[in-house]
């Protein structure tokens, strides 16, 4: 028996998230089905995190155990041949049996793309949220500064979050305009349910002039979901990188 670690990318548009759910098409479900076809084993896959329906990944990490004798240099090709075009295994490597894709994570990075054109780009609509009026990126970056560090992010997580400890550490939160796109990059030790999307939704309201940047400090201190902005659409969010 050996433990393998894979880095994968996927277009989350047509999936009901990463985690297996009854009667739903999920990323985990597709991978486990592919593994069963190539090994004949019932293999459980463990991911670094559970992306929601519609959220994409460029650097999702998984691990699984297998007794298969498939050569290491063939694994990527064998699996990709069994997966839909919307899921790609980027790398496969053997790791120590103690490695865990979820519990060993040190840093996660998510990026959110906003199409800031007056008219939406049809070729980007699966991967970016469209905001037609120009955003004040400088104001958004000022606001983002208040969220960096260790804080209770109750105001920035879904009311459906049942985790008691809502303290997380954000190592970096940047807002950058690249051409006609605005990118929000968030790095942290972990994120609550909808946390990044609520942060982005609130920053967009700052960029639209609906909020003052300093309000972010007050919203954070309030520990009240109703004080923050809307939850940004899932399609603009990508799990970019996971660091161990």
UniProtKB/Swiss-Prot annotation:
Domain of life the protein comes from: Bacteria
Function as written in the Swiss-Prot or TrEMBL entry: Formation of pseudouridine at positions 38, 39 and 40 in the anticodon stem and loop of transfer RNAs.
Organism, as annotated: Brevibacillus brevis (strain 47 / JCM 6285 / NBRC 100599)
Positions of substrate binding: 110
GO molecular function list: RNA binding; tRNA pseudouridine(38-40) synthase activity
Gene3D superfamilies: Pseudouridine synthase I, catalytic domain, C-terminal subdomain, Pseudouridine synthase I, catalytic domain, N-terminal subdomain
Family per record: Belongs to the tRNA pseudouridine synthase TruA family.
Active site: 52 (nucleophile)
A Pfam family reported for this protein in Swiss-Prot or TrEMBL: PseudoU_synth_1
Entry-linked CDD domains: PseudoU_synth_EcTruA
Cleaved signal peptide residues: none
Assembly and oligomerization: Homodimer.
GO biological process, one term: tRNA pseudouridine synthesis
Protein name per Swiss-Prot or TrEMBL: tRNA pseudouridine synthase A
Gene that encodes the chain: truA
Keyword match Isomerase: yes
Statement: the UniProt record of this protein carries the keyword Acetylation: no
Record keywords, A-Z: Isomerase, tRNA processing
The protein's enzyme class: isomerase
């Amino acid at each position: 028996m050996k433990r393998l670690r894979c880095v994968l990318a996927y277009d989350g548009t047509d999936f009901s998230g990463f985690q297996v759910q009854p009667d739903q098409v999920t990323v985990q479900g597709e991978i486990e089905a592919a593994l069963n076809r190539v090994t004949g084993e019932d293999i459980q896959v463990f991911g670094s995190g559970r992306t929601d329906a519609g959220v994409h990944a460029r650097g999702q990490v998984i691990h699984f155990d297998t007794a298969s004798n498939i050569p290491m240099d063939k694994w990527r090709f064998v699996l990709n041949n069994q997966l839909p075009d919307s899921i790609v295994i980027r790398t496969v490597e053997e790791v120590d049996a103690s490695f865990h894709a979820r519990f060993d994570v040190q840093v996660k990075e998510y990026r959110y793309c906003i199409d800031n054109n007056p008219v939406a780009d049809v070729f980007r609509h699966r991967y970016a949220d469209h905001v037609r009026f120009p955003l004040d990126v400088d104001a958004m970056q000022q606001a983002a500064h208040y969220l960096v560090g260790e804080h209770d992010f109750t105001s920035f997580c879904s009311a459906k979050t049942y985790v008691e400890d809502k303290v997380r550490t954000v190592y970096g939160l940047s807002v950058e305009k690249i051409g006609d796109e605005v990118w929000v990059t968030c790095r942290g030790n972990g994120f609550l349910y909808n946390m990044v999307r609520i942060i982005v939704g609130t920053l967009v309201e700052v960029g639209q002039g609906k909020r003052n940047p300093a309000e972010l400090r007050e919203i954070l201190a309030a520990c009240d979901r109703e004080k923050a902005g809307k939850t940004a659409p899932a399609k603009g969010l990508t799990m970019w990188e996971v660091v161990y």
